[in-house]
Every structure is written in C-alpha cells, then in structure tokens.
Amino acid sequence: MFAVLKTGGKQYKVQAGDVLRVEKLACEAGDKIQFNDILMVGGDSVTVGAPFVAGAAVQAEVIAQIKGEKTIHYVKRRRKHSSQRTKGHRQQLTLLRVTDVLASGADASGVAAATGTADARRAAHNASAKE
C-alpha cells in the first residue's frame, strides 16, 4: 500500500519502510509522528482526495535532525569593481522512516500530528503574547 503525503510544501509518494528527508519538523529523534495531509492512498484500489483523503494517515518515526548539502551561491555585486562574494547555505532537514500507511482510522491511532518548525514558533509566540 502506498500514499502521497504533503509536508513542507512538497509531495512525497511513500510506503511502509521508506526513509525520507523532509523539511525540518518540530520533533526529536525517536519520536513517532503522523501526517494527516494525505492526497492519495493506493493499493488494491486507489482513493484520491479532494483535496485530502478523510481518515487516512501516514505514521513515521524520526531518525535524526540533519542538514542538507551545502549550496554555494556566487555573488558579483557591481560591474567594473572587483567586489565578489560567495554565500553558502545548508537546509535543516528531518530524516524519517515510514512505519505504517493507514487508509482509515487515523483519528483513533493516538500518535501526535507532525508540525513544522514555523508552526511551533508561532504557537510559542502566541503563548508568550497571552501572558
């Protein structure tokens, strides 16, 4: 059985046992998380959501928080002047192992939903603003 899930603005086709590198999620290594934004579930029959499949989920285990490959950007500032600079960036990623694809019954699984780091920062900011 496979599923197409959406996280970090990207879509991934996964099945049980797959290892994924996704945009950083607010969780620690060893945590079990669940993705509820499932666009499609396939197997014996295919179910396509509009936009999401109701009750479907993908459960995964966090292996590690890692950094991606370094991308180097060469910047030349002005013509006729020798001002040049290189800038680098390493994207923060979360390494996951997919443990289960659920076509239904995701609400009763008891596994915490996956949230991105922006969601965690926003929740912390809103909590501090209320105090």
Curated annotation (Swiss-Prot):
GO cellular-component terms in the record? Answer: cytoplasm; ribonucleoprotein complex; ribosome
Question: Which SUPFAM superfamilies is this protein grouped with?
Answer: L21p-like (SSF141091)
Q: Name one GO molecular function term.
A: structural constituent of ribosome
| InterPro entries linked | bL21-like, bL21-like_sf, Ribosomal_bL21
GO BP of this protein: translation
The coiled-coil segments of this chain are none
- Which parts of this chain are annotated as the region Disordered? 111-131
What is known about what this protein does? Answer: This protein binds to 23S rRNA in the presence of protein L20.
- PANTHER family the UniProt entry points to: 50S RIBOSOMAL PROTEIN L21, LARGE RIBOSOMAL SUBUNIT PROTEIN BL21M
Describe, as the record does, how this protein assembles with itself and its partners: Part of the 50S ribosomal subunit. Contacts protein L20.
| Record-given protein name | Large ribosomal subunit protein bL21
Q: Give the gene that encodes this protein.
A: rplU
